[in-house]
Amino acid sequence: MSQASSSPGEGPSSEAAAISEAEAASGSFGRLHCQVLRLITNVEGGSLEAGRLRLLDLRTNIEVSRPSVLCCFQENKSPHDTVDLTDLNIKGRCVVGEQDRLLVDLNNFGPRRLTPGSENNTVSVLAFALPLDRVPVSGLHLFQSQRRGGEENRPRMEARAIIRRTAHHWAVRLTVTPNWRRRTDSSLEAGQIFVSQFAFRAGAIPLTLVDALEQLACSDPNTYIHKTETDERGQWIMLFLHHDSPHPPTSVFLHFSVYTHRAEVVARHNPYPHLRRLPDNGFQLLIPKSFTLTRIHPEYIVQIQNAFETNQTHDTIFFPENIPGVSIEAGPLPDRVRITLRVTLTGDQAVHLEHRQPLGRIHFFRRGFWTLTPGKPDKIKRPQVQLRAGLFPRSNVMRGAVSEFLPQSPGLPPTEEEEEEEEEDDEDDLSSTPTPTPLSEAMFAGFEEASGDEDSDTQAGLSRALILTGQRRRSGNNGALTLVIPSWHVFASLDDLVPLTVSVQHAALRPTSYLRSDMDGDVRTAADISSTLRSVPAPRPSPISTASTSSTPRSRPRI
Protein backbone atom coordinates (compact mmCIF):
# COMPACT_ATOMS: atom_id res chain seq x y z
CA MET A 1 0.00 0.00 0.00
CA SER A 2 1.55 3.25 -1.11
CA GLN A 3 1.76 6.23 1.17
CA ALA A 4 -0.18 9.35 0.35
CA SER A 5 1.96 12.08 -1.09
CA SER A 6 2.47 15.03 1.23
CA SER A 7 2.34 18.62 0.13
CA PRO A 8 5.45 20.86 0.37
CA GLY A 9 6.11 22.02 3.91
CA GLU A 10 3.93 19.33 5.48
CA GLY A 11 4.12 15.70 6.45
CA PRO A 12 7.09 13.44 7.18
CA SER A 13 9.36 15.03 4.62
CA SER A 14 9.14 18.49 6.20
CA GLU A 15 9.57 17.04 9.70
CA ALA A 16 12.68 15.15 8.61
CA ALA A 17 14.04 18.31 7.02
CA ALA A 18 13.44 20.27 10.22
CA ILE A 19 15.12 17.57 12.30
CA SER A 20 18.11 17.41 9.97
CA GLU A 21 18.42 21.20 9.99
CA ALA A 22 18.36 21.28 13.81
CA GLU A 23 20.97 18.51 13.98
CA ALA A 24 23.17 20.39 11.51
CA ALA A 25 22.82 23.56 13.55
CA SER A 26 23.65 21.72 16.75
CA GLY A 27 26.72 20.18 15.15
CA SER A 28 27.94 23.55 13.89
CA PHE A 29 27.53 25.14 17.30
CA GLY A 30 28.85 22.13 19.16
CA ARG A 31 32.59 22.60 18.59
CA LEU A 32 33.96 26.03 17.69
CA HIS A 33 37.62 27.07 17.63
CA CYS A 34 38.54 30.73 17.89
CA GLN A 35 40.58 33.31 19.75
CA VAL A 36 37.59 35.45 20.78
CA LEU A 37 33.93 34.47 20.98
CA ARG A 38 31.26 37.09 20.47
CA LEU A 39 27.97 35.87 21.93
CA ILE A 40 24.78 37.79 21.16
CA THR A 41 21.96 36.43 23.27
CA ASN A 42 18.31 37.11 23.97
CA VAL A 43 17.35 37.02 27.64
CA GLU A 44 14.48 34.59 28.25
CA GLY A 45 13.13 32.35 30.96
CA GLY A 46 11.65 34.97 33.26
CA SER A 47 11.34 38.67 33.99
CA LEU A 48 13.71 41.07 35.70
CA GLU A 49 12.36 44.00 37.65
CA ALA A 50 13.99 47.42 37.42
CA GLY A 51 16.91 47.77 39.82
CA ARG A 52 17.09 44.01 40.44
CA LEU A 53 19.73 41.34 39.94
CA ARG A 54 19.53 37.80 38.59
CA LEU A 55 21.97 35.26 37.21
CA LEU A 56 22.13 34.87 33.44
CA ASP A 57 22.98 31.41 32.12
CA LEU A 58 24.46 31.85 28.64
CA ARG A 59 24.32 28.06 28.03
CA THR A 60 27.83 28.13 26.62
CA ASN A 61 30.97 26.26 27.69
CA ILE A 62 34.53 27.32 26.87
CA GLU A 63 37.69 25.23 27.16
CA VAL A 64 41.41 25.82 26.70
CA SER A 65 44.40 23.51 26.51
CA ARG A 66 46.40 25.16 29.31
CA PRO A 67 45.69 27.00 32.57
CA SER A 68 44.45 30.48 31.69
CA VAL A 69 42.26 33.31 32.89
CA LEU A 70 38.89 32.78 31.20
CA CYS A 71 37.13 36.14 30.84
CA CYS A 72 33.62 37.11 29.80
CA PHE A 73 33.03 40.88 29.48
CA GLN A 74 30.14 42.87 28.09
CA GLU A 75 30.94 44.14 24.59
CA ASN A 76 31.36 47.80 23.75
CA LYS A 77 28.66 49.16 21.47
CA SER A 78 31.01 51.72 19.87
CA PRO A 79 34.61 52.94 20.24
CA HIS A 80 33.33 55.82 22.38
CA ASP A 81 31.00 53.80 24.58
CA THR A 82 30.75 54.90 28.21
CA VAL A 83 29.75 53.06 31.34
CA ASP A 84 26.10 54.00 31.14
CA LEU A 85 24.47 52.09 33.99
CA THR A 86 20.94 52.79 32.77
CA ASP A 87 20.24 49.56 30.92
CA LEU A 88 21.00 45.84 31.13
CA ASN A 89 24.45 45.36 32.59
CA ILE A 90 26.56 42.20 32.75
CA LYS A 91 29.17 41.93 35.47
CA GLY A 92 32.58 40.89 34.19
CA ARG A 93 33.45 37.26 34.89
CA CYS A 94 37.00 35.94 35.40
CA VAL A 95 37.77 32.28 36.12
CA VAL A 96 41.22 30.69 36.37
CA GLY A 97 41.40 27.17 34.96
CA GLU A 98 40.94 25.22 31.75
CA GLN A 99 37.14 25.27 31.37
CA ASP A 100 34.17 27.36 32.42
CA ARG A 101 30.44 27.56 31.94
CA LEU A 102 29.40 31.15 31.30
CA LEU A 103 27.13 32.19 34.17
CA VAL A 104 27.12 35.95 34.85
CA ASP A 105 25.33 38.53 36.99
CA LEU A 106 22.70 40.54 35.09
CA ASN A 107 21.57 43.86 36.57
CA ASN A 108 18.61 45.81 35.25
CA PHE A 109 19.57 49.45 35.77
CA GLY A 110 16.81 50.57 33.41
CA PRO A 111 13.54 52.16 34.55
CA ARG A 112 11.36 49.39 33.11
CA ARG A 113 10.78 45.75 33.85
CA LEU A 114 12.50 43.29 31.54
CA THR A 115 10.25 40.64 30.01
CA PRO A 116 11.06 37.93 27.44
CA GLY A 117 9.13 39.80 24.77
CA SER A 118 10.61 43.26 25.41
CA GLU A 119 12.70 45.03 22.79
CA ASN A 120 15.82 45.69 24.87
CA ASN A 121 16.45 42.14 26.05
CA THR A 122 19.51 41.52 23.83
CA VAL A 123 23.02 41.61 25.27
CA SER A 124 26.41 40.96 23.69
CA VAL A 125 29.50 39.58 25.44
CA LEU A 126 33.06 38.71 24.45
CA ALA A 127 34.75 35.60 25.83
CA PHE A 128 38.53 35.15 25.65
CA ALA A 129 41.40 33.49 27.52
CA LEU A 130 44.58 35.11 28.86
CA PRO A 131 47.73 32.93 29.08
CA LEU A 132 49.42 32.32 32.42
CA ASP A 133 53.16 31.84 31.94
CA ARG A 134 55.44 30.83 34.77
CA VAL A 135 56.69 33.90 36.65
CA PRO A 136 59.04 33.38 39.64
CA VAL A 137 58.36 35.75 42.53
CA SER A 138 60.55 36.38 45.56
CA GLY A 139 58.38 36.28 48.65
CA LEU A 140 60.91 37.74 51.10
CA HIS A 141 63.30 39.97 49.21
CA LEU A 142 66.47 41.27 50.87
CA PHE A 143 66.17 45.02 50.43
CA GLN A 144 69.12 47.29 51.13
CA SER A 145 68.23 49.71 53.88
CA GLN A 146 68.49 53.42 53.21
CA ARG A 147 71.01 55.64 54.95
CA ARG A 148 69.97 56.11 58.57
CA GLY A 149 72.70 58.36 59.88
CA GLY A 150 75.32 55.84 60.90
CA GLU A 151 76.01 52.72 62.86
CA GLU A 152 74.29 54.03 65.99
CA ASN A 153 70.89 53.80 64.29
CA ARG A 154 71.19 50.06 63.78
CA PRO A 155 68.58 48.13 65.83
CA ARG A 156 69.93 47.76 69.34
CA MET A 157 68.60 44.23 69.81
CA GLU A 158 70.94 41.68 68.31
CA ALA A 159 70.80 37.91 68.01
CA ARG A 160 73.48 35.30 67.64
CA ALA A 161 72.88 33.08 64.65
CA ILE A 162 74.26 29.71 63.54
CA ILE A 163 75.00 29.92 59.81
CA ARG A 164 75.85 26.90 57.67
CA ARG A 165 76.62 26.70 53.98
CA THR A 166 74.68 24.13 51.94
CA ALA A 167 74.68 23.28 48.26
CA HIS A 168 72.50 26.14 47.06
CA HIS A 169 71.81 28.39 50.06
CA TRP A 170 72.86 29.42 53.55
CA ALA A 171 70.86 27.90 56.42
CA VAL A 172 70.38 30.17 59.43
CA ARG A 173 69.12 29.17 62.90
CA LEU A 174 68.70 31.62 65.74
CA THR A 175 66.78 32.25 68.96
CA VAL A 176 65.72 35.77 69.88
CA THR A 177 63.85 37.47 72.72
CA PRO A 178 61.72 40.03 70.87
CA ASN A 179 60.87 43.44 72.25
CA TRP A 180 57.26 43.56 71.09
CA ARG A 181 55.43 46.80 70.32
CA ARG A 182 51.69 46.95 69.76
CA ARG A 183 50.48 48.67 66.60
CA THR A 184 46.84 49.33 65.74
CA ASP A 185 45.64 48.47 62.22
CA SER A 186 41.95 48.77 61.37
CA SER A 187 42.38 46.73 58.18
CA LEU A 188 43.09 43.53 60.16
CA GLU A 189 40.62 41.19 61.81
CA ALA A 190 42.11 41.69 65.29
CA GLY A 191 42.54 45.43 64.78
CA GLN A 192 46.14 45.24 65.99
CA ILE A 193 49.50 43.64 65.31
CA PHE A 194 52.62 43.15 67.44
CA VAL A 195 55.91 44.09 65.77
CA SER A 196 59.57 43.68 66.65
CA GLN A 197 62.91 43.95 64.88
CA PHE A 198 66.45 42.75 65.45
CA ALA A 199 69.68 42.21 63.56
CA PHE A 200 72.35 39.52 63.31
CA ARG A 201 75.77 39.47 61.72
CA ALA A 202 75.78 38.01 58.21
CA GLY A 203 79.14 36.34 58.73
CA ALA A 204 80.16 34.40 55.63
CA ILE A 205 76.93 35.18 53.75
CA PRO A 206 77.85 37.38 50.73
CA LEU A 207 75.14 40.04 50.95
CA THR A 208 76.17 41.43 47.56
CA LEU A 209 75.13 38.15 45.90
CA VAL A 210 72.11 36.86 47.82
CA ASP A 211 68.76 38.61 47.45
CA ALA A 212 66.03 36.37 48.94
CA LEU A 213 65.05 34.71 52.20
CA GLU A 214 62.63 31.87 52.89
CA GLN A 215 61.23 31.08 56.33
CA LEU A 216 61.39 27.34 57.00
CA ALA A 217 60.27 27.02 60.62
CA CYS A 218 59.20 29.10 63.60
CA SER A 219 58.54 28.05 67.19
CA ASP A 220 55.33 30.13 67.34
CA PRO A 221 52.61 29.54 64.69
CA ASN A 222 51.37 33.15 64.86
CA THR A 223 54.81 34.73 64.40
CA TYR A 224 56.40 35.26 61.00
CA ILE A 225 59.11 37.31 59.31
CA HIS A 226 57.41 40.35 57.79
CA LYS A 227 60.35 42.09 56.08
CA THR A 228 64.13 41.75 55.69
CA GLU A 229 66.85 44.31 55.04
CA THR A 230 70.62 44.53 54.82
CA ASP A 231 72.80 47.42 55.91
CA GLU A 232 74.88 49.49 53.52
CA ARG A 233 78.16 47.95 54.63
CA GLY A 234 76.96 44.39 54.00
CA GLN A 235 77.58 43.16 57.53
CA TRP A 236 74.14 42.88 59.12
CA ILE A 237 70.77 41.35 58.22
CA MET A 238 67.75 42.95 59.88
CA LEU A 239 64.54 41.01 60.44
CA PHE A 240 61.14 42.54 61.17
CA LEU A 241 58.77 40.17 63.00
CA HIS A 242 54.97 40.28 63.16
CA HIS A 243 52.69 38.49 65.59
CA ASP A 244 48.90 38.46 65.08
CA SER A 245 47.53 37.02 68.34
CA PRO A 246 46.77 38.92 71.58
CA HIS A 247 49.64 37.24 73.48
CA PRO A 248 53.05 37.33 71.75
CA PRO A 249 55.75 34.88 72.91
CA THR A 250 58.72 35.94 74.99
CA SER A 251 61.17 33.85 72.97
CA VAL A 252 61.15 32.86 69.29
CA PHE A 253 63.23 30.27 67.42
CA LEU A 254 63.63 30.84 63.66
CA HIS A 255 65.01 28.65 60.90
CA PHE A 256 65.32 30.17 57.43
CA SER A 257 67.46 30.03 54.31
CA VAL A 258 69.20 32.85 52.42
CA TYR A 259 69.84 32.35 48.71
CA THR A 260 70.19 33.99 45.29
CA HIS A 261 66.94 34.20 43.33
CA ARG A 262 67.21 37.10 40.85
CA ALA A 263 63.45 37.15 40.35
CA GLU A 264 61.97 39.82 38.11
CA VAL A 265 58.98 40.24 40.44
CA VAL A 266 59.37 40.75 44.19
CA ALA A 267 56.92 41.42 47.00
CA ARG A 268 57.60 44.41 49.23
CA HIS A 269 56.79 42.33 52.33
CA ASN A 270 56.14 38.71 53.18
CA PRO A 271 53.00 37.64 51.25
CA TYR A 272 51.83 35.62 54.24
CA PRO A 273 49.17 35.69 55.68
CA HIS A 274 46.86 37.44 53.17
CA LEU A 275 48.50 36.42 49.89
CA ARG A 276 48.66 32.69 49.21
CA ARG A 277 51.24 31.71 46.62
CA LEU A 278 50.02 29.86 43.51
CA PRO A 279 52.18 27.18 41.84
CA ASP A 280 53.39 28.96 38.68
CA ASN A 281 51.97 32.46 38.46
CA GLY A 282 50.57 34.82 41.03
CA PHE A 283 48.86 34.78 44.41
CA GLN A 284 45.41 34.21 45.83
CA LEU A 285 44.22 37.20 47.84
CA LEU A 286 42.50 36.44 51.15
CA ILE A 287 40.24 38.92 52.94
CA PRO A 288 42.15 40.39 55.93
CA LYS A 289 39.01 41.38 57.84
CA SER A 290 35.42 40.14 57.71
CA PHE A 291 32.74 42.65 56.71
CA THR A 292 29.09 42.83 55.70
CA LEU A 293 27.66 44.75 52.74
CA THR A 294 24.13 46.08 53.26
CA ARG A 295 21.90 48.59 51.51
CA ILE A 296 22.81 51.10 54.24
CA HIS A 297 26.55 50.41 53.94
CA PRO A 298 26.99 49.13 50.37
CA GLU A 299 30.76 49.71 50.05
CA TYR A 300 33.90 48.51 51.78
CA ILE A 301 37.57 49.05 50.95
CA VAL A 302 39.85 46.05 51.41
CA GLN A 303 43.44 46.99 52.24
CA ILE A 304 46.42 44.67 51.96
CA GLN A 305 49.60 46.02 53.53
CA ASN A 306 51.76 44.80 50.68
CA ALA A 307 52.75 45.63 47.11
CA PHE A 308 54.73 44.19 44.21
CA GLU A 309 57.76 45.54 42.39
CA THR A 310 58.30 44.36 38.81
CA ASN A 311 61.00 46.79 37.56
CA GLN A 312 58.83 47.46 34.50
CA THR A 313 59.08 43.83 33.34
CA HIS A 314 55.52 42.68 34.12
CA ASP A 315 51.99 43.97 34.53
CA THR A 316 50.24 42.99 37.76
CA ILE A 317 46.52 42.29 37.22
CA PHE A 318 43.93 41.47 39.87
CA PHE A 319 41.04 39.18 38.86
CA PRO A 320 38.24 39.06 41.46
CA GLU A 321 36.15 36.08 42.47
CA ASN A 322 32.62 35.73 41.10
CA ILE A 323 30.50 36.49 44.16
CA PRO A 324 26.82 36.97 43.21
CA GLY A 325 25.52 40.40 44.17
CA VAL A 326 29.00 41.84 44.76
CA SER A 327 31.17 43.96 42.44
CA ILE A 328 34.92 44.07 43.14
CA GLU A 329 37.50 46.29 41.51
CA ALA A 330 39.53 44.45 38.87
CA GLY A 331 42.49 45.37 36.74
CA PRO A 332 46.12 46.53 36.86
CA LEU A 333 47.81 47.16 40.20
CA PRO A 334 50.58 49.80 40.21
CA ASP A 335 54.08 48.96 41.38
CA ARG A 336 55.11 49.73 44.96
CA VAL A 337 51.62 50.91 45.92
CA ARG A 338 49.59 49.33 48.71
CA ILE A 339 46.82 47.06 47.41
CA THR A 340 43.38 48.63 47.89
CA LEU A 341 40.19 47.16 46.41
CA ARG A 342 36.71 48.63 46.58
CA VAL A 343 33.92 46.08 47.13
CA THR A 344 30.35 47.18 46.32
CA LEU A 345 26.95 45.58 46.86
CA THR A 346 24.94 45.26 43.63
CA GLY A 347 22.20 42.87 44.74
CA ASP A 348 19.16 43.18 46.96
CA GLN A 349 20.29 41.13 49.95
CA ALA A 350 23.11 41.77 52.41
CA VAL A 351 26.30 39.81 51.76
CA HIS A 352 28.79 38.81 54.46
CA LEU A 353 32.40 38.05 53.54
CA GLU A 354 34.47 36.09 56.03
CA HIS A 355 38.01 36.62 57.25
CA ARG A 356 40.52 34.82 54.97
CA GLN A 357 37.84 34.13 52.38
CA PRO A 358 39.31 34.23 48.83
CA LEU A 359 38.57 37.58 47.18
CA GLY A 360 40.43 37.02 43.91
CA ARG A 361 43.76 36.26 42.28
CA ILE A 362 46.77 38.32 41.29
CA HIS A 363 48.58 37.27 38.11
CA PHE A 364 51.56 38.65 36.22
CA PHE A 365 51.84 39.26 32.48
CA ARG A 366 55.09 40.05 30.74
CA ARG A 367 55.45 43.65 29.67
CA GLY A 368 54.24 43.95 26.08
CA PHE A 369 51.25 41.64 26.38
CA TRP A 370 49.11 44.59 27.48
CA THR A 371 49.67 47.85 25.61
CA LEU A 372 48.57 51.18 27.03
CA THR A 373 45.93 52.79 24.84
CA PRO A 374 47.34 55.93 23.15
CA GLY A 375 46.32 59.12 24.92
CA LYS A 376 45.76 57.46 28.30
CA PRO A 377 47.99 58.43 31.25
CA ASP A 378 48.16 55.02 32.92
CA LYS A 379 46.50 51.65 33.34
CA ILE A 380 43.66 51.68 35.88
CA LYS A 381 41.29 49.24 37.57
CA ARG A 382 37.49 49.28 37.46
CA PRO A 383 34.61 47.54 39.28
CA GLN A 384 33.31 44.35 37.73
CA VAL A 385 30.05 46.00 36.66
CA GLN A 386 32.10 48.45 34.55
CA LEU A 387 34.25 45.89 32.76
CA ARG A 388 33.90 46.16 28.99
CA ALA A 389 35.72 44.67 26.00
CA GLY A 390 35.68 45.50 22.31
CA LEU A 391 37.14 44.41 18.99
CA PHE A 392 38.53 47.32 16.96
CA PRO A 393 41.10 47.65 14.15
CA ARG A 394 44.62 48.22 15.38
CA SER A 395 45.00 51.30 13.18
CA ASN A 396 41.97 52.92 14.82
CA VAL A 397 43.28 52.14 18.29
CA MET A 398 46.76 53.50 17.57
CA ARG A 399 45.42 56.80 16.21
CA GLY A 400 43.32 57.32 19.34
CA ALA A 401 39.90 56.47 17.91
CA VAL A 402 38.95 54.73 21.16
CA SER A 403 38.08 57.63 23.42
CA GLU A 404 38.55 58.09 27.16
CA PHE A 405 36.52 55.50 29.06
CA LEU A 406 34.73 57.49 31.77
CA PRO A 407 31.68 56.48 33.81
CA GLN A 408 28.55 58.40 32.94
CA SER A 409 26.16 59.46 35.68
CA PRO A 410 22.89 57.49 35.45
CA GLY A 411 20.02 59.48 34.06
CA LEU A 412 22.10 62.30 32.53
CA PRO A 413 21.66 62.61 28.75
CA PRO A 414 24.76 63.19 26.60
CA THR A 415 25.57 66.68 25.44
CA GLU A 416 25.11 67.82 21.84
CA GLU A 417 28.85 67.70 21.22
CA GLU A 418 29.02 64.11 22.51
CA GLU A 419 26.09 63.09 20.30
CA GLU A 420 27.69 64.63 17.21
CA GLU A 421 31.03 63.00 18.04
CA GLU A 422 29.39 59.59 18.49
CA GLU A 423 27.55 59.88 15.16
CA GLU A 424 30.75 60.77 13.30
CA ASP A 425 32.74 58.01 14.97
CA ASP A 426 30.02 55.44 14.30
CA GLU A 427 30.06 56.29 10.60
CA ASP A 428 33.86 55.98 10.45
CA ASP A 429 34.35 52.87 12.57
CA LEU A 430 31.30 50.68 12.06
CA SER A 431 32.39 49.94 8.52
CA SER A 432 35.62 48.37 9.76
CA THR A 433 34.16 46.60 12.78
CA PRO A 434 32.69 43.19 11.90
CA THR A 435 29.03 43.03 12.85
CA PRO A 436 26.57 40.18 12.36
CA THR A 437 24.75 40.18 9.03
CA PRO A 438 20.93 39.98 8.82
CA LEU A 439 19.39 36.76 10.04
CA SER A 440 17.76 35.91 6.74
CA GLU A 441 21.07 36.08 4.86
CA ALA A 442 23.47 34.52 7.34
CA MET A 443 21.74 31.37 8.55
CA PHE A 444 24.67 29.08 9.37
CA ALA A 445 26.70 30.76 6.60
CA GLY A 446 29.71 31.17 8.84
CA PHE A 447 30.72 27.52 8.45
CA GLU A 448 30.35 27.00 4.73
CA GLU A 449 34.10 27.28 4.27
CA ALA A 450 34.92 25.13 7.31
CA SER A 451 35.49 21.43 6.97
CA GLY A 452 33.75 18.81 9.01
CA ASP A 453 37.03 17.65 10.52
CA GLU A 454 37.63 21.10 11.98
CA ASP A 455 34.33 21.09 13.82
CA SER A 456 34.68 17.55 15.10
CA ASP A 457 38.38 17.36 15.85
CA THR A 458 39.65 19.72 18.52
CA GLN A 459 43.33 19.22 17.77
CA ALA A 460 42.89 19.93 14.07
CA GLY A 461 41.04 23.14 14.83
CA LEU A 462 43.70 24.31 17.26
CA SER A 463 46.47 23.48 14.79
CA ARG A 464 44.77 25.52 12.09
CA ALA A 465 44.37 28.43 14.48
CA LEU A 466 48.07 28.33 15.39
CA ILE A 467 49.09 28.26 11.71
CA LEU A 468 46.93 31.28 10.93
CA THR A 469 48.31 33.06 13.98
CA GLY A 470 51.88 32.58 12.76
CA GLN A 471 50.96 33.84 9.28
CA ARG A 472 49.44 37.03 10.68
CA ARG A 473 52.41 37.66 12.95
CA ARG A 474 54.73 37.52 9.97
CA SER A 475 52.48 39.73 7.85
CA GLY A 476 51.91 42.42 10.53
CA ASN A 477 48.57 43.68 9.24
CA ASN A 478 47.59 46.97 10.90
CA GLY A 479 43.98 46.45 9.86
CA ALA A 480 43.71 43.37 12.05
CA LEU A 481 41.38 43.48 15.01
CA THR A 482 42.69 43.93 18.53
CA LEU A 483 41.07 43.14 21.84
CA VAL A 484 40.53 46.43 23.67
CA ILE A 485 39.75 46.58 27.40
CA PRO A 486 38.80 50.27 27.67
CA SER A 487 37.98 49.80 31.34
CA TRP A 488 41.72 49.28 31.98
CA HIS A 489 43.04 51.58 29.18
CA VAL A 490 44.79 48.63 27.52
CA PHE A 491 44.58 46.48 24.40
CA ALA A 492 46.12 43.17 23.34
CA SER A 493 46.76 41.30 20.12
CA LEU A 494 44.48 38.40 19.26
CA ASP A 495 47.57 36.33 18.45
CA ASP A 496 48.65 36.43 22.11
CA LEU A 497 45.39 34.99 23.43
CA VAL A 498 44.86 31.31 24.18
CA PRO A 499 42.71 29.52 21.54
CA LEU A 500 39.22 28.67 22.74
CA THR A 501 37.11 25.59 22.17
CA VAL A 502 33.47 26.66 22.47
CA SER A 503 30.31 24.59 22.66
CA VAL A 504 26.83 26.07 22.73
CA GLN A 505 24.14 23.89 24.25
CA HIS A 506 21.46 22.59 21.91
CA ALA A 507 18.73 24.02 24.19
CA ALA A 508 20.09 27.53 23.55
CA LEU A 509 19.60 27.34 19.78
CA ARG A 510 16.65 28.98 18.07
CA PRO A 511 15.43 28.68 14.47
CA THR A 512 17.04 32.06 13.77
CA SER A 513 20.39 31.33 15.47
CA TYR A 514 23.39 31.75 13.20
CA LEU A 515 27.19 31.83 13.13
CA ARG A 516 29.70 34.19 11.60
CA SER A 517 33.46 33.93 11.16
CA ASP A 518 35.89 36.87 10.96
CA MET A 519 39.68 37.26 10.91
CA ASP A 520 40.20 33.79 9.38
CA GLY A 521 38.22 32.19 12.17
CA ASP A 522 39.88 34.05 15.04
CA VAL A 523 36.61 35.80 15.89
CA ARG A 524 33.47 33.69 15.93
CA THR A 525 30.06 35.28 16.42
CA ALA A 526 27.19 33.17 17.74
CA ALA A 527 24.08 35.32 17.46
CA ASP A 528 20.43 35.06 18.43
CA ILE A 529 21.23 32.54 21.17
CA SER A 530 18.69 31.94 23.90
CA SER A 531 19.78 32.42 27.53
CA THR A 532 17.85 31.90 30.73
CA LEU A 533 17.54 33.79 34.01
CA ARG A 534 18.24 32.11 37.34
CA SER A 535 17.67 33.15 40.90
CA VAL A 536 20.62 34.45 42.88
CA PRO A 537 21.65 31.90 45.53
CA ALA A 538 21.08 32.93 49.12
CA PRO A 539 24.12 34.80 50.44
CA ARG A 540 26.05 33.70 53.48
CA PRO A 541 24.23 34.97 56.60
CA SER A 542 26.00 37.72 58.48
CA PRO A 543 26.63 37.55 62.24
CA ILE A 544 24.27 40.51 62.68
CA SER A 545 21.35 38.70 61.06
CA THR A 546 21.97 35.34 62.77
CA ALA A 547 22.36 36.79 66.26
CA SER A 548 18.74 37.93 66.40
CA THR A 549 16.02 35.32 66.93
CA SER A 550 13.10 37.75 66.94
CA SER A 551 10.59 37.47 64.09
CA THR A 552 10.08 41.25 64.03
CA PRO A 553 12.29 42.89 61.38
CA ARG A 554 14.56 45.71 62.42
CA SER A 555 15.58 48.65 60.26
CA ARG A 556 19.11 48.62 61.67
CA PRO A 557 21.14 46.44 64.05
CA ARG A 558 21.13 47.23 67.75
CA ILE A 559 24.43 48.58 69.04
UniProtKB/Swiss-Prot annotation:
What is the organism lineage in this UniProt record? Viruses, Duplodnaviria, Heunggongvirae, Peploviricota, Herviviricetes
Query: Which residues are recorded as modified (S-nitrosocysteine)?
Result: 218
**Biological function:** Stimulates viral immediate-early (IE) transcription. Plays a role in the inhibition of the host innate repsonse by targeting STING1 and thus the cGAS-STING pathway. Also counteracts host DAXX-mediated repression of viral transcription. Displaces a DAXX-binding protein, ATRX, from nuclear domain 10 sites (ND10) shortly after infection. Increases the basal level of SUMOylated DAXX in infected cells. Stimulates quiescent cells to re-enter the cell cycle, proceed through G1 and enter the S phase.
Q: Which organism is it from?
A: Human cytomegalovirus (strain Merlin)
Segments of this protein annotated with the region Disordered = 404-440, 530-559
UniProt-recorded name of the protein: Protein pp71
The domain of life for this entry's organism is Viruses
Coiled-coil annotation reads none
Biased-composition ranges, Low complexity, are 431-440, 543-559
Per UniProt, what is the name of the gene that codes for the protein in this document? UL82
- Give the main localization category: virion
